[in-house]
Every structure is written in C-alpha cells, then in structure tokens.
Amino acid sequence: MDIKAFEVEEWMNRYEDDAKYNIAETCVESLKVGELLDIASIERNEFFGKLAETKLTYGAIPGSLGLREEITKLYHNKKTTENVIVTNGGIGANFLALFTLVGPGDEVVAVYPTYQQLYSLPEALGAKVRRLRLEPGDGYMPDINKLRTLVKSNTKAIVINTPNNPTGACFGEG
C-alpha cells in the first residue's frame, strides 16, 4: 500500500514550533488536566487517588462499556452499545471506516479541498477517487448536480466532512 505523505502535518512539523504566530493550527488550545477537572467539578485528590489504583490493562477493543453506554445515551434512538466503537480520534475512525468499505477497483467520490486522509487513503487502498470541487463562489458548498455526474453505479462511497476542513463550510440539510 502506497500512502502519500500527509502534507499539512509535514509542513506543521517543520514550522509550527518556531513560529511567532501560529496561524496554521487546526485545533483549539489544549486544556491542562487540572483545568478539565475544574470544569467538571471533580476534586483532584479523589480523582488522582482513583487513578493511582487503576489497573493498566489492554482494555476492551471497542472501548470501555461505561463510555459506550454514555455515548449511546447522547443519541436518543434505538442504538445500543454494540453500535458504538470508540476510536483514537477522527483519524482512527476515518481509517476504520474507509479500510472497511473501500478496496481495489472501487470508486469513491470525495469533496475537495478536504482533509487529505479522506481522499488519499481510498487511493492507497486501490480505489479511483473522483473529486467534487468545492468552489469559493458557492461558499464552498457542494454542488448536488456536479455530485450526480460524479456518482456512478459502482461508486462505493461518497466522502463528505462537515464542517469542512480546511474551508470551515458547514453543509446543512437541503
């Protein structure tokens, strides 16, 4: 499998630590553990006492049952914890979804510009990727008629991320 270099990460690795003003960051400023505990109104000594007694195991493959139960509660429908898999962030979730759905010879349509993984991973998996270009004049909103021309009978996936990275455009309903 030939996975292309992740260009934005390579650029950030090269320049972000020495930049006086980092205008390339894609994340919010990180919280310190103490700040997170304060926001959640959790007493630090109690938390760290429990943490010190926590046995370090490999853990449940789909994520801890307690966490999956809490995630399930967020969505008031008939889904169960069996429908929830906890991943190591969006990159891990994207990888699992694309690796599961896409293979050699498949066709994928992906909006562009977008997060590089969303088109380069299907290409690395052997799929032909058709790009639905998001245009500034359209507010970076997808053109449904253009999408219709790109989707073929053998299209395996349509990859859209919202809010779009890097444009920030939020695709609504209708």
Features from the language model and the residues they span:
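N-terminal small-domain helix-loop-helix segment of the aminotransferase-like
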Residues: 2-89
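Glycine-rich helix-loop-beta junction characteristic of Rossmann-like nucleotide cofactor-binding loops
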Residues: 75-78, 98-102
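Conserved PLP-anchoring active-site segment centered on the Schiff-base-forming lysine
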Residues: 100-122
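Active-site phosphate-binding strand-loop segment of PLP-dependent enzymes
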Residues: 136-174
